[in-house]
């Protein structure tokens, strides 16, 4: 079997971290004996510059045919038209592929807890995953309008939309430490009242998983005061957007966090959670670990290569533990150095 992978380098540091990761994929495929082919497509701001829109039909159709999609990063201050922004291409891609589940693991690597802005004893060994609903909620709700006197956004969830994301979270929790925290604003929002009701109903199908409910403001506090209490967190789109960014800084850098977005069937999208960092683009100083860890998720989930994913992750964790990092993590290596060291380790 030959896997079909679509590469979307995007903007800013996206091309350099994605292209380096693809060089690692070539080494890994030879080592673990699997075949793949790559289609490169412009996306985001780069696509706006070339084609006038962030996501062309050609690119979208290629993504629909793919087994997996690897995305570098998109966006930047260059693209200011509110009706034609790079981020709108990503929203359209998620909606078109029905990528309703976003998985964001956050791990504090052994020996790297000193990098965290929190006290080491609070974060040592922290390992949690946030499961975020990605294609409904206030980002997609209708009606919506904006003028100089009034603005309206709509927050809507159906039972089916809640059930499908909650099942993903329960299954993930069952495969880990068996604890699920559901986050809502049930004390004031009608959508959250339905959310909590559905979570309680679905929980009956997963007796091996312990469930607790937290209001979103309480959860944001506990992520800082006691992050190690969490295993899997599930939440709606807006809450997940905010909480996952909060959680991602606990290891010490946004550059350490990967993510995966998927539907019940069809291709999955893998990307680091950080932005395009246009201020450092092309300077060979970007931290590529988030992108490489996203590649590891792709190897495990879409390319059926769990051993390769484990090896790649372990090499990264060992590098971080021994201070072989870029400057944002206190190290002295540049982007190219990271890829060269990992290439040597994988070829060993």
From Swiss-Prot:
Q: Which reaction does it catalyse?
A: (2R,3S)-3-isopropylmalate + NAD(+) = 4-methyl-2-oxopentanoate + CO2 + NADH
Organism of derivation: Staphylococcus aureus (strain MW2)
Q: Which family does it belong to?
A: Belongs to the isocitrate and isopropylmalate dehydrogenases family. LeuB type 1 subfamily.
Keyword check for Oxidoreductase: yes
NCBIfam families in the cross-refs: leuB
What keywords appear on the UniProt entry?
Amino-acid biosynthesis, Branched-chain amino acid biosynthesis, Cytoplasm, Leucine biosynthesis, Magnesium, Manganese, Metal-binding, NAD, Oxidoreductase
Quaternary form?
A: Homodimer.
The entry's localization annotation reads: Cytoplasm
Q: PROSITE patterns from the xrefs? A: IDH_IMDH
A Pfam family (short name) is Iso_dh
The Swiss-Prot or TrEMBL record annotates one GO molecular function as:
NAD binding
Q: Can you cite an annotated GO cellular component?
A: cytosol
EC numbers on record? 1.1.1.85
Q: Give the protein's recorded name.
A: 3-isopropylmalate dehydrogenase
Gene3D superfamilies linked: Isopropylmalate Dehydrogenase
Which cofactor is recorded for it?
A: Mg(2+); Mn(2+)
